[in-house]
């Protein structure tokens, strides 16, 4: 069988790609999941200045909060160099348009593919900023948009809510609906740190308590990368600047390269966990990474039966018939993002605030 982009991503039906106007902003639910309605965050109530004592800010009751926010620190637009070639990322022009010629020779234009700085943010209704929690940073794969794929098809916000774990989501738009894994600003030193820092006030607003920004600014981070999301995931581990705030890495059929960066993080960060689930498309690279780790004396598990602890390294092969396109919802189990979060939450050390996080 082939291993082309079309093999891994068979074209969906028209309805899958272009939902009707009246359902575009509705978060789709699995049949057995409780129904939730996405609501907008309530603005803070207007208050008149007073010398008298006032009650502390009370966060209004709310439901799941899911929205798109533009961030300067998101992956694109990106005007820097491609670190693989040390040449400008935008390496082709036509009139006033600038674009990027990919390794496969295809040209993608900045105004169509690399100009969306929006981030999908999600705060579950039961999230409590006063308790230990994590920020899940999700790097999507090729041929994706945040609404159609990450939210509605892969159900990443819903998986986080359904896990019951005290977690929020940040999912930056990478190359829009393109066969391109470029990391943009996540290639840059400190890129992930700036991204999470800029997100803090927006997450606090979505949560309904502006005072929660400090907690979000110091919260531990879990990186999830699907397919082509391996590039920003790897570079975020290598140069992202978050140090031991990154408590876990979960790759979904995503080990297509950057093995040295993943191996280095695993060897040097024994306080976090690493999980890679894979199909035949990435099996060769996963096996190569396993061998690299064994040579460094790292113990490897080959199933998800046990708990996730600091230092856990797990590689899970999934059988034939499990498709790459549906892997974010159907891997070794249904809703694997939910499964990993549940196993992570059973180990308090993984969600405890890192020492010195406020200054990291």
Where are the language model's segments positioned?
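Extracytoplasmic/secreted cell-surface and envelope-processing proteins
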Residues: 146-148, 178-181, 231-233, 257-262, ...
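A domain-start/cap signature at the N-terminus of enzymes
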Residues: 3-134, 301-302, 352-359
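Active-site machinery of serine-nucleophile hydrolases
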Residues: 130-205
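Short glycine-enriched nucleophile-adjacent loop
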Residues: 230-241
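Alpha/beta-hydrolase fold nucleophile elbow
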Residues: 212-227
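C-terminal catalytic histidine-bearing segment of alpha/beta-hydrolase fold enzymes
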Residues: 46, 55, 276-360
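A conserved short beta-strand
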Residues: 243-256
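A catalytic-pocket lid/entrance helix-loop region that shapes and gates access to the active site
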Residues: 255-257, 264-284
């Amino acid at each position: 069988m082939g291993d082309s982009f079309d093999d891994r991503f068979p074209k969906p039906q028209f309805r899958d790609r272009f939902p009707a106007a009246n359902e575009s902003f509705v978060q789709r639910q699995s049949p057995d999941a409780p129904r939730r309605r996405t609501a907008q965050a309530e603005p803070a109530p207007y208050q008149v200045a007073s010398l008298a004592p006032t009650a502390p800010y009370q966060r209004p009751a709310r439901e799941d909060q899911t929205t798109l926010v533009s961030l300067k620190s998101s992956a694109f637009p990106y005007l820097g160099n491609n670190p693989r070639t040390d040449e400008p990322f935008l390496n082709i022009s036509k009139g006033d348009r600038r674009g990027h010629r990919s390794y496969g020779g295809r040209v993608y234009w900045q105004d169509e593919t690399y100009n969306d700085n929006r981030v999908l943010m999600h705060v579950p209704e039961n999230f409590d900023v006063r308790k230990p929690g994590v920020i899940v940073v999700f790097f999507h794969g090729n041929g994706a948009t945040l609404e159609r794929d990450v939210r509605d098809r892969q159900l990443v916000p819903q998986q986080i809510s359904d896990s019951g774990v005290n977690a929020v989501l940040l999912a930056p738009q990478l190359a829009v609906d393109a066969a391109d894994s470029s990391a943009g600003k996540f290639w840059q030193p400190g890129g992930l740190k700036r991204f999470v820092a800029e997100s803090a006030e927006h997450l606090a607003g979505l949560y309904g308590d502006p005072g929660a920004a400090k907690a979000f600014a110091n919260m531990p981070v879990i990186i999830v990368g699907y397919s082509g999301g391996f590039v920003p995931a790897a570079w975020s581990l290598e140069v992202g600047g978050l140090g031991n705030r990154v408590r876990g890495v979960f790759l979904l059929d995503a080990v297509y390269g950057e093995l040295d960066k993943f191996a280095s993080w695993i060897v040097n960060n024994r306080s976090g966990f690493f999980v890679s689930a894979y199909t035949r498309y990435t099996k060769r690279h996963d096996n190569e990474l396993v061998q690299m780790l064994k040579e460094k004396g790292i113990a490897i598990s080959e199933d998800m039966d046990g708990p996730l602890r600091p230092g856990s390294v797990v590689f899970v092969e999934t059988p034939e018939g499990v498709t790459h396109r549906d892997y974010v919802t159907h891997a070794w189990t249904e809703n694997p993002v939910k499964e990993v979060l549940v196993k992570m939450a059973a180990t308090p050390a993984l969600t405890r605030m890192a020492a010195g996080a406020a200054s990291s």
